[in-house]
Amino acid sequence: MGISRDSRHKRSATGAKRAQFRKKRKFELGRQPANTKIGAKRIHSVRTRGGNKKYRALRIETGNFSWASEGISKKTRIAGVVYHPSNNELVRTNTLTKAAIVQIDATPFRQWFEAHYGQTLGKKKNVKEEETVAKSKNAERKWAARAASAKIESSVESQFSAGRLYACISSRPGQSGRCDGYILEGEELAFYLRRLTAKK
């Protein structure tokens, strides 16, 4: 029996079983879930209706994640799934889907922040090795102008100290073959942090 996306097999609103007046059709087909896992990139192409293609990511380990408040995006490594709104089983098996909350490597974002604002992020304040490197006057002027906007919220800064950021996947790895998303901030981050602590 193939997977079908029709609704003719469902009971009616009154609970009556519908009569089968036709067989399954090709345009109603469904496919098995991709169940994308974290690992070395493995992507299969699937021929779909109209000769189009879908890209089924079976294994993927990196993605482009955007930092909305700073207006940048960086390619970074995905560490693991920590929360899923629909199913705890997907957390246990580290399955990547849209809307999954994952932890990503903070290094590319930390390096960008330090280059852009000239301030260390997620490190102890008493470390002084970097101050020996001479910076140009032009760089100093740029950093001085940007200093006012170099504030980030404390809950995000504490994640930089740990080297892992919470992010939400916004692409569909089983359809597009990509695992892209955005870093959680503000009320959304607070909501998911509450969910994570409640789960423990």
Curated annotation (Swiss-Prot):
CDD domains in the cross-refs: Ribosomal_S8e_like (cd11380)
GO cellular component, one term: 90S preribosome
Keyword S-adenosyl-L-methionine: no
Region Disordered, annotated ranges: 1-31
Residue positions where Phosphoserine is found in the record: S66, S69, S73, S86, S154, S155, S158, S161
Keyword Ribonucleoprotein found: yes
PROSITE patterns, A to Z: RIBOSOMAL_S8E
UniProt xrefs under InterPro entries: Ribosomal_eS8 (IPR001047), Ribosomal_eS8_CS (IPR018283), Ribosomal_protein_eS8_euk (IPR042563), Ribosomal_Se8/biogenesis_NSA2 (IPR022309)
Annotated keywords: Cytoplasm, Phosphoprotein, Ribonucleoprotein, Ribosomal protein
GO molecular function: structural constituent of ribosome
Localization: Cytoplasm
Gene3D superfamilies: 3.10.290.70, Ribosomal protein S8e, subdomain (1.10.168.20)
Modified residues (Phosphothreonine): T62, T107
GO biological process terms held by the UniProt record: maturation of SSU-rRNA from tricistronic rRNA transcript (SSU-rRNA, 5.8S rRNA, LSU-rRNA); translation
Location (main, coarse): cytoplasm
Assembly and binders: Component of the small ribosomal subunit (SSU). Mature yeast ribosomes consist of a small (40S) and a large (60S) subunit. The 40S small subunit contains 1 molecule of ribosomal RNA (18S rRNA) and 33 different proteins (encoded by 57 genes). The large 60S subunit contains 3 rRNA molecules (25S, 5.8S and 5S rRNA) and 46 different proteins (encoded by 81 genes).
Additional free-text comment from the UniProt record: Present with 15900 molecules/cell in log phase SD medium. There are 2 genes for eS8 in yeast.
Role noted for this protein: Component of the ribosome, a large ribonucleoprotein complex responsible for the synthesis of proteins in the cell. The small ribosomal subunit (SSU) binds messenger RNAs (mRNAs) and translates the encoded message by selecting cognate aminoacyl-transfer RNA (tRNA) molecules. The large subunit (LSU) contains the ribosomal catalytic site termed the peptidyl transferase center (PTC), which catalyzes the formation of peptide bonds, thereby polymerizing the amino acids delivered by tRNAs into a polypeptide chain.
Family (UniProt): Belongs to the eukaryotic ribosomal protein eS8 family.
Name of the protein in its database record: Small ribosomal subunit protein eS8A
Source organism per UniProt: Saccharomyces cerevisiae (strain ATCC 204508 / S288c) (Baker's yeast)
Species lineage: Eukaryota, Fungi, Dikarya, Ascomycota, Saccharomycotina
